[in-house]
Amino acid sequence: VSHPGIPPAKAVVVAMSIGILETGRPAPALASRHGDYVEMAAGLLAAGAPTPLPEVARFAVIDGEFPDSATRCDAWVVTGSRHSATEEAPWMLRLEALLREAVAAGRPVIGLCFGHQILAKALGGRVEPSPFGWQLGLQDYRVVDAPDWLAGLGPTIGLNAIHQDHVSVVPPGARLLATAPHCPNAALVYGKAAISFQGHPEFTRDFERDLLALYGGDTLPADRAGQALAAMEGGGLTADALTIADALRRFIAEK
C-alpha cells in the first residue's frame, strides 16, 4: 500500500487545513510497506472521497513539534501510538491542553485509538488498563447512538484493533457511539466538537495482519495474536471504515 508523503506543517499553507498530530510510529519494516500513522490517517480521510482532500499538515507532537495555536488548522486528527495515555509524559500533557483548546475553539477533533484515549483524558475522562487485556484483530462494536452525519452505519461496526488500555470513565458531555462487552466505551461523540474510536478505522487489514505477525509472541500475547491472525480475511480498509471515512469528511465540513 503506498501513501503520498505528508509534508511538515511549516510547508503547508492552505485555506482549509487538517492537522494530523503524530503520537507514534510503526516499526520501520511496517512503515516501509504501509506508510506511517500520519499517512494512514490521511489515507482514511481520502478513502472514497469524490474530490481531492485538502492538504494536511503533520505535527510530530511525540517529538515536541506542536502547532503554535489550536486554531492553526481547521480540524485535527490524533493518531494511534504504542505509548499509553496513562504515562503523562510532558508531550502528552501538552497535547491534552492543545485538545482542550481545539474543542473550545470549535476546531473538530478526531481521535484514533491512543487519540481516543488521550482526548477522553483531556476532557475529564479516565484511561486505565483494560480488565479484558489485549484486544487484537477485527473487532465488532454495537452502534448505540449515531448522530445524523454518521448515517449509513449498520447496527454493528467492524474495525481493526490493538490495545490494552481503555476509556474506563467517559468525560462529561460525551455520548456513547459504540460499545462491546470487551470495550464498553468503544467510540464517543462530543456533540459537534469531537469524535473518537478505540478501534483503528485507518488500519488496513494488510497492515493489521503484518502488525500481529511481527509482535505476536513478543509484545503481544501469542495466543491472542494467533487467534486474531487466523480470523483475518481480505485486505484494504474494512467496509465500515469506508463508511466512517465518508462520515468524518462530513463532520469536518459541517464544523
Language-model features and meaning:
Residues 123-206:
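Pocket-forming structural segment of enzyme catalytic cores
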